[in-house]
A protein has these predicted regions:
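C-terminal accessory "lid"/substrate-recognition subdomains
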Residues: 4-7, 160, 168, 174-187
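Pre-Walker A (Motif I) flank of P-loop NTPase domains
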Residues: 9-12, 78
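Hydrophobic anchor at the beta1->P-loop junction of P-loop NTPases
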Residues: 15
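P-loop (Walker A) phosphate-binding loop of NTP-binding proteins
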Residues: 18
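Conserved lysine of the Walker
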Residues: 23
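Conserved substrate/cofactor phosphate-moiety recognition/catalytic segment
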Residues: 28-71
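Glycine-rich phosphate-binding loop used to anchor ATP phosphates in small-molecule kinases
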Residues: 61-112, 127
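A glycine- and Lys/Arg-enriched "phosphate-lid" helix/loop adjacent to the NTP-binding pocket
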Residues: 98-168, 181
Length: 187
């Protein structure tokens, strides 16, 4: 299908990384600054709705809920789609908490195009409890970060690692998204 001149191609940005690294905050900051559409984290809705911790049997429902939210947002074709998370987080949490994950998560992840992953480091910011978080130890969050980075590199996903204090994270993320938005589309 030929692209009409002057019509921007949707760019999809994913915030990834361990808990308490600023993903939701940064997604909201990006949305406020650049506009577009932001998709939240389905697992938070799931836990709030069911009022209990998750188990391995919940992972397919959580992943399908996340996909439904993402796909509904994609269907609207915003100039910029900001995802607070995606299936990689569901996969890694399932592995971390339950030692297993539904194999179809890999296929679904690789079937979708993501223009940029902003991978947030656990370094330089404090872990904050919020009733759903469970990795207060920096070593655990570092392992989650490394698992995310390893997957992205293995699957040749575009990634920018975001580090530093909150102001530095915001500045780095804004610069990466700005660069993405001015780059020519190749899709």
């Amino acid at each position: 299908m030929a692209r009409r001149p002057g019509v921007a191609h949707m760019k999809v940005v994913v915030l990834a990384g361990p808990e308490s690294s600023g993903k939701s905050w940064l997604a909201a900051e990006l949305h406020a600054h650049f506009g577009g559409l932001m998709v939240g984290e389905y697992v938070r809705y799931f836990i709030d709705h069911h009022q209990r911790d998750t188990c391995l049997a919940d992972i397919p429902d959580i992943a399908l809920g996340q996909l439904a939210w993402e796909d509904a947002a994609r269907a609207t074709q915003p100039r910029l789609l900001i995802l607070d998370t995606h299936l990689l987080t569901n996969k890694l949490w399932s592995q971390t908490l339950f030692g297993d994950y539904p194999a179809w998560l890999d296929d679904e992840l690789l079937a979708r195009h993501y223009d940029l992953h902003l991978l947030l480091s656990p370094e330089d910011v404090e872990w904050t409890a919020d009733g759903q978080r469970c990795q207060p130890e920096l070593a655990d969050r570092r392992a989650f970060f490394q698992g995310s980075l390893d997957w992205m590199q293995q699957h040749h996903q575009p990634v920018v690692v975001i580090r530093g204090d909150w102001a530095a994270r915001r500045s780095q993320a804004f610069a990466a998204v700005e660069q993405l938005l001015v780059a020519p589309s190749h899709a």
